[in-house]
Every structure is written in structure tokens, then in C-alpha cells.
């Protein structure tokens, strides 16, 4: 399958493309160097201080990558991954069926990994995005991150834009642009009808405003706990809440 190039930066230095097996380790490296150390919930639970916890989240991310809708930003000069959007397709559950995040939190062994996934699950459950979007499937930008030395170049914003374009291509063009990291042919369905994300810091929330996303709910960090302590205890005073946001395509 031809690798889909979704966009190129104005200075032609960065390509935005589907995640493939060749770049999986580089994409995971972005999480280790940036996301686990800087993202608010990751900081609160202390995941970067626990190698086994990072391994557990890495394993989960590898599984998510097999859904074929994750994206990377690639430095064309160095051929290195400098940004990533690990995206997950979330299908509407029926009855009392447990969410994917809930099931994962049950099998995580390391407390930081368990608490990070429980945060994601609890935040998602504070509002019914499927009802708000009148959708049976959502594309969730699960982990969005850029290497620190590539900051202030609009990479995370472009990854969000391209995630929306990918979802629109699946829904309206019926073009199967899913890219399996194992090289397998993936089914076109499920097809997302909206894109959503948890924006956990002021910088990521500015992306939501810039791209005209809708805030579904705002949640104070004092309602999320790790090792018996609220997230708010471990985060700076200028970041006291997270938002659940969406964009209907």
C-alpha cells in the first residue's frame, strides 16, 4: 500500500503522514521524550518515573496503531518522527458493555499506567459524545505530542487538522486510507462521524479554539486521583482543568 502523505509544512521541512511500521519506534520515542514527561495527566500520575508503566502504555499504543488511523509528523531532512497523533476508533457500546479504556485499566499492573487510563476513561464518561455528535463511531486523538525542540511550529495543530481530514476521507469519500502497521488490508468500517480529544493543558486547548472545536465538558483536576491524591496537587496553578472536545465532520 502506498503511504499516504496528508500535508507538508509551508517551508517543506515536515511531512504529515500515516504511521507505518518503519516509524513506530520513532513515534513511541516521541511519547517517551515528550508526552509522558510533559502532558498533564502523565505528570500527575508520574508515569515517566516508572519504566514498566511506560512499557504498559507503549504496548497499548502499539495495539491502537494497528487500527490504521494514527499519524506522524516527519522531519524530511533527518527522516525522524518529531510529532505524533495516536488515534483510536471508538465504537458506541451497547448496554452495560465496558469501554476499551475501562477494560485496559483492569489489566494494567503498574499504578501510574492504571491511573492514566482510568483518567481517560472517567473523563470520557462525563459526557455522552456519541449522543452529542449523533454518531456510532468517533475518532479519538488519544495521545498528541511533539518533541520539545520542534515546539511552536504548529505541528500538533496540523496533526489535529489532518486527523479530521482522515476521518472525512473515510466518511465522505469512502476511501480506505487506513494504514495497518503490519501491512495488512484493513476494513473500511468502522467509519468515524466525529473527531474528539481530551485537551489537558492550555496549549492544547488553544488548538481546539483555533480549529473551532466544541467543548463538551470542562473537568477540574481535583476529581481525578492517583495514589489517593488529586491530580491538582501535582499540576501548576495555571492548569486546573481538562476539556473534552469534539468536531463533527
Give the positions of each predicted feature.
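Short hydrophobic/aromatic beta-strand or adjacent loop that forms the aromatic wall/cage
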Residues: 68, 239-244
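Conserved acetyl-CoA-binding loop of GNAT-fold acetyltransferases
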Residues: 172, 209-219
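Glycine-rich acyl-CoA binding loop
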Residues: 152-160
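Short amphipathic alpha-helix that is part of the acyltransferase structural core
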Residues: 2-59, 65-129
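Conserved GNAT acetyl-CoA-binding A-motif
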Residues: 136-141, 167-200
Amino acid at each position: 500500500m502506498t503511504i499516504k502523505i496528508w500535508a507538508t509544512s509551508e517551508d517543506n521541512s515536515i511531512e504529515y503522514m500515516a504511521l507505518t511500521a518503519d516509524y513506530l519506534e520513532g513515534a513511541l520515542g516521541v511519547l517517551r521524550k515528550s508526552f509522558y514527561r510533559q502532558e498533564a495527566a502523565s505528570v500527575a500520575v508520574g508515569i515517566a518515573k516508572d519504566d514498566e508503566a511506560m512499557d504498559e502504555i507503549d504496548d497499548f499504543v502499539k495495539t491502537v496503531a494497528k487500527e490504521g488511523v494514527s499519524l506522524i509528523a516527519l522531519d524530511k531532512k533527518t527522516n525522524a518522527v518529531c510529532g505524533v497523533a495516536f488515534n483510536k476508533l471508538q465504537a458506541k457500546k451497547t448496554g452495560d458493555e465496558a469501554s476499551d479504556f475501562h477494560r485496559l485499566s483492569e489489566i494494567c499492573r503498574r499504578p501510574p499506567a492504571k491511573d492514566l487510563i482510568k483518567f481517560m476513561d472517567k473523563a470520557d464518561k462525563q459526557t455522552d459524545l456519541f449522543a452529542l455528535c449523533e454518531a456510532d463511531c468517533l475518532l479519538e486523538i488519544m495521545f498528541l505530542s511533539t518533541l520539545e525542540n520542534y515546539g511552536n511550529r504548529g505541528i500538533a495543530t496540523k496533526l489535529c487538522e489532518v486527523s479530521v481530514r482522515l476521518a472525512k476521507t473515510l466518511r465522505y469519500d469512502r476511501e480506505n486510507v487506513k494504514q495497518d502497521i503490519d501491512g495488512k488490508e484493513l476494513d473500511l468500517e468502522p467509519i468515524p462521524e466525529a473527531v474528539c480529544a481530551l485537551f489537558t493543558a492550555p496549549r492544547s486547548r488553544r488548538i481546539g479554539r483555533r480549529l473551532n472545536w466544541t467543548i463538551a465538558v470542562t473537568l477540574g483536576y481535583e476529581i481525578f486521583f492517583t495514589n489517593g491524591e488529586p491530580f491538582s496537587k501535582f499540576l501548576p496553578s495555571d492548569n486546573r482543568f481538562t476539556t473534552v472536545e469534539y468536531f463533527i465532520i
